[in-house]
Amino acid sequence: MNSNALSLLGLCRKANKLSMGHDMCKGAVTSAKACVCLVSSDSSERVYDEFSSLCGSKNIPIFRIEPTIDEIHHLIGYKAGIITIDDGGFAKSFMKNFKEYRPGEETLYDK
């Protein structure tokens, strides 16, 4: 994963544009506040499947990212296996720096 994308997560945290942890992320997704959902590499398949169906129903992209829960903790200062970016501008910037970025998806983050 691109280091610029990772550093952007810290910036999102400081700007209070991240939801972190299962319950906060579930609320952000169900209220359609989330623009992108990110699941750590060591989170369970059950969590990924749960959020995959939730995000699919709200047309919110979801990605499994390389950092582990501990690495995310080091980046944002909060131990969470799942996070959402809740700002369209930050989501676009993250996706431009994200290794698996797919052209054309930027229209999904105009919330």
Task: Please describe what each predicted stretch is.
Residues 4, 46, 67, 89, ...:
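Charged, alpha-helix-enriched surfaces in structured cytosolic catalytic cores
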Residues 6, 26-27, 51, 70-75:
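Short, flexible, solvent-exposed loop/turn segments with mixed acidic/basic and small polar residues
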Residues 30, 34-52, 61:
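N-terminal positively charged helical leader segments and presequences
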